[in-house]
């Protein structure tokens, strides 16, 4: 279950980073 929590955490960070990049580009 630990790896699932890690993946979910990484996914959230990646999502925030992607949104930040999109906002910067736009």
From Swiss-Prot:
Where are the Valine amide residues found in this chain? 26
What tissues harbor this protein?
Expressed by the skin glands.
- Asked if the record carries the keyword Secreted, the reply is yes
Sorted alphabetically, which InterPro entries does this protein's record hold? Dermaseptin_dom
Return the GO cellular component terms, semicolon-separated: extracellular region
In which compartments does the protein localize?
A: Secreted
Q: Which GO terms describe its biological process?
A: defense response to bacterium
- Supply the alphabetized keyword list: Amidation, Amphibian defense peptide, Antibiotic, Antimicrobial, Secreted
- Is Secreted there in the keyword field? yes
* Purpose of the protein: Has antimicrobial activity.
Name the record gives this protein: Dermaseptin-J3
